[in-house]
Each structure stands twice: as structure tokens, then as C-alpha cells.
Amino acid sequence: MTFRIETAARGRFAVFILSGRIEAPAIAELRRLFELQSDYRDIVLDLKDVGVVDRDVMHFFARCEADGVKLDNCAPYIREWMEREKD
């Protein structure tokens, strides 16, 4: 299964709507898109349609959130995994 990234604007936020199975190779594309933004605090990752993520992506999401990126519609299993890895 592949992943997909759609972009949208929500007020002052650049929204990246992710779907599918997100694996480590997707991180480079997400970083590239982030670099096109002037401020990470203005980025939202909408994870509503994300099915599965691998460990690298989970760590990437955690770092993004720590840097001020908003994670919308984050699946409970991803959120719990991020919390467990923090400990």
C-alpha cells in the first residue's frame, strides 16, 4: 500500500493530509514539504486516513509535535506508541 499527501490551507496553517501506510521513505518527502513553509508552527498534519506507520515515522511525528507541528486526528495507537517511547 502506498501513501498519499494532499495539501490544503486552513487559515494561517498549511495542512498536509496524509493517507495510507506511512513508512520511513515518506519522511524525506514530508521534510521537503516542511522546508517550503516559513514556520513549523504553521503546519498541521492531518492523520485521519493513515492506516499504519512504522517506528521511524512514529518518531518523526513525535519530533514534529515537539517542534510545534499540530497532529490532527492522530490514531490512538500512534499517540499511545509516541507516549510509550517518550518514557
PLM ranges: what are they?
Residues 1-15:
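Short beta-strand/loop segment at the start of cytosolic alpha/beta domains
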Residues 18-87:
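Amphipathic alpha-helical interaction surfaces in cytosolic regulatory modules
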